[in-house]
């Protein structure tokens, strides 16, 4: 898990004081990264969109007030939700609240964590959520078959799923599953059916032929997943 941490602080603040705050958070996040397997990448507000795109999540570290423009300019280069860690003093929290409010007004999602007791746990949770978001954005899900009357056209459904949920939706004809199931290796299908029967405490129905048919369908689905490089179907 790679996380870009971007520090923002007002140029009117004492440099040594701001540097001391930054070093404190760097040390604390290093401990968190070591315990959770998170790789933190540190940047200043001049970080490019290309550099940010190499990470899975964005953590904006607000070290003082007077950082609204800097923070918003960073978020504008990022495609995804943002976690904002606000120093507990020097108007940093007020700046963080304004940054998030303005970012939300143009479609960005995010949360604020104040740098007080327990903040590392909150940041860890925020990063876990960001990882889930990133995984969903990379996911490809297969949708098999169609109905005579569709509520939404396939292209519209693909767009809605992508926008709201994140994954790319791929529509596949049901006939492809039927063909792959028929072509499934008989020995492999029998092994899977036997495994399912052995794992069951009791079988009333289906019968052996139905179990074998289910195993063939499973092998057909697995072939579709492999050929189309799907994460789910």
Residue ranges and their predicted role:
Residues 1-232:
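An N-terminal assembly and electron-transfer interface module characteristic of large anaerobic redox
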């Amino acid at each position: 898990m790679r996380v870009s941490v971007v520090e923002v602080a007002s140029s009117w603040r004492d440099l040594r004081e701001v540097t001391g705050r930054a070093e404190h958070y760097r040390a604390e996040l290093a401990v968190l990264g070591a315990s959770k397997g998170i790789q933190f990448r540190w940047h200043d507000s001049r970080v490019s969109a290309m550099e940010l795109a190499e990470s899975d999540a964005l953590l904006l570290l607000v070290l003082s007030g007077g950082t609204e423009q800097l923070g918003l300019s960073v978020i504008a280069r990022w495609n995804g939700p943002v976690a904002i860690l606000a120093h507990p003093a020097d108007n940093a929290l007020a700046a963080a609240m304004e940054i998030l409010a303005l970012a939300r007004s143009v479609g960005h999602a995010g949360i604020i964590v104040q740098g007080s007791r327990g903040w590392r746990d909150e940041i860890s949770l925020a990063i876990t959520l960001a990882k889930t978001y990133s995984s969903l954005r990379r996911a490809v899900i297969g949708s098999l078959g169609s109905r005579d009357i569709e509520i939404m056209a396939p292209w519209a459904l693909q767009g809605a799923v992508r926008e709201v949920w994140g994954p790319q939706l791929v529509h596949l004809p049901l006939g492809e599953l039927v063909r792959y199931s028929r072509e499934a290796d008989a020995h492999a299908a029998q092994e899977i059916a036997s495994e399912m029967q052995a794992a069951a405490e009791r079988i009333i129905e289906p019968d052996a032929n139905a179990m074998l048919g289910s195993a063939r369908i499973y092998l057909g689905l697995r072939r579709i997943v492999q050929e189309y490089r799907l994460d789910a179907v």
